[in-house]
Regions:
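N-terminal export/targeting leaders of redox proteins
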Residues: 1-121, 163-167, 173, 183-193, ...
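Electrostatic cytochrome c docking/interface patches
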Residues: 86-126, 207-239, 253-255
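Extracytoplasmic electron-transfer domains, predominantly the class I c-type cytochrome c fold
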Residues: 103-108, 112, 116, 137, ...
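Inter-heme linker and motif-flanking segments adjacent to c-type heme-binding CXXCH motifs
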Residues: 119-122, 145-147, 182-187, 205-218, ...
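N-terminal juxtadomain amphipathic helix
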Residues: 128-129, 149
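The canonical Cys-X-X-Cys-His
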Residues: 130-143, 198, 235-254, 267, ...
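An extracellular/luminal cadherin ectodomain-centered signature
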Residues: 194-201
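C-terminal cap of thioredoxin/glutaredoxin-like
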Residues: 241, 245-246, 251-253, 262, ...
Length: 369
């Protein structure tokens, strides 16, 4: 405001001086003392114009003389899916449209998903909470790949009443389930910077998805049950021919050069997911593998048959891995999935059949009126 006042005062002073000079020239002309006709008329007019413009700029709201802004094209929703299509996560370039603080939080959340071990692993820079795997090892492409165990329906379906715990669970509780089971670690503080960042990322991914809606392509594809039990021996053959190049002959995975995390995760052993993880259920592991493994596979162009997929799942989940106390799981045992491998059950099928199948007879039992 101060510079505007200074300009107005300066223009007024100039106007006064010009009027004085014009009057002086007029007197000199009348007495014949001025040989040529001199007038300040045009200078005075120009100064008045400048004064009016300056006064208008000073009094009118800021931006009154600016050209009308051009409205940007409306941004499509973050969620990119249609009823007849598949959900996939948005391009992170869209984060630039958010305020700086929220953008930074979401980007940090995404980085925690892709490089979990660097922050929370055995040598993590923030804490030492997990087994060295990354969330992205199971939730592909930072949880955005169709049928890649993605996060597309997390925000729309939580809080969620889950049969496994028998409780209404928040997003934070679901994240910590993965921390304690898939990453075989300990829970994050639910109000920590890291948890808030992960939740913000999941909320952003779920933008535009209606509450309680589950778009096609979210989570893991459901495969039809085999009419036989899945066979670990056949699965070993599949593993040897299709999986060893990335996961190693002993399923140990491949570490990054700096030893901070896994490029390809261990499929069993002390650094793999424990027996409480979702992928320890054969249907979950098989559906995940079918659409995504080996490298280069997609849901449209799988490289394994359904039988190979079920068998390799049986082989991997027959190998040793960390245990977990599951006594608090499935308080209503009638709600256990058909492929939950630990009793007790309300049916009479064995734990072995619940683990490897055939599953159709078990499913039929629970469908009886």
């Amino acid at each position: 405001m101060l510079p505007g006042i200074v300009v107005l005062i300066a223009l007024l002073l100039v106007l006064v001086v010009l009027h004085v000079l014009d009057d002086a020239f007029k007197v000199l002309r009348e007495h014949g003392d001025l040989p040529i006709k001199v007038s300040m008329r045009w200078s005075i007019r120009a100064t008045w114009i400048l004064l009016v413009l300056a006064l208008g700029q000073f009094l009118l709201p800021e931006g009154a003389f600016d050209a009308d802004p051009v409205s940007p094209a409306p941004l499509p929703q973050v969620a990119t899916y249609a009823e007849d299509g598949l959900w996939s996560g948005a391009d992170t370039a869209r984060l630039a449209y958010l305020d700086d603080e929220l953008e930074a939080r979401i980007r940090y959340g995404r980085e925690l998903i892709t490089r979990t071990a660097a922050f929370l692993g055995p040598n993590g820079s923030v804490a030492h909470l997990t087994n060295g795997m990354n969330c992205q090892n199971c939730h592909l492409d930072a949880g955005t790949r169709p049928w890649g165990n993605n996060y597309g329906a997390v925000w729309s379906t939580y809080p969620n009443m889950r049969s496994r715990s028998g409780k209404l669970e928040s997003v934070e509780k679901r994240v910590n389930d993965c921390m304690e089971r898939s990453l075989n670690g300990v829970a994050l503080d639910s109000v920590s910077k890291e948890m808030r960042a992960i939740v913000a990322y999941m909320e952003w991914l779920g933008t535009g998805i209606a509450k309680d809606s589950v778009p096609k392509g979210t989570g893991i594809e459901r495969l039809a049950f085999l009419d036989r039990a899945a066979d670990p021996a056949r699965g070993h053959e599949v593993f040897t021919s299709k999986c060893v190049s990335c996961h190693g002959p002993q399923g140990e995975g491949v570490m990054s050069k700096d030893g901070a995390t896994y490029l390809y995760p261990p499929l069993w052993g002390e650094h793999s997911y424990n027996q409480g993880a979702g992928l320890f259920r054969l249907s979950r592991f098989a559906g995940y593998v079918k659409a995504n493994m080996p490298q280069g596979s997609t849901y449209e162009h799988p490289q394994l048959s359904d039988e190979e997929t079920w068998d390799v799942a049986a082989f991997v989940n027959s190998q040793p891995r960390p245990t977990k106390d599951l006594t608090g799981d499935w308080p209503d045992i009638s709600k256990k999935p058909v492929d939950h491998p630990f009793g007790p059950y309300v049916d009479t099928f064995t734990e072995t059949q619940h683990k490897y199948g055939p599953f159709a007879p078990i499913a039929a039992f629970y469908k009886k009126p």
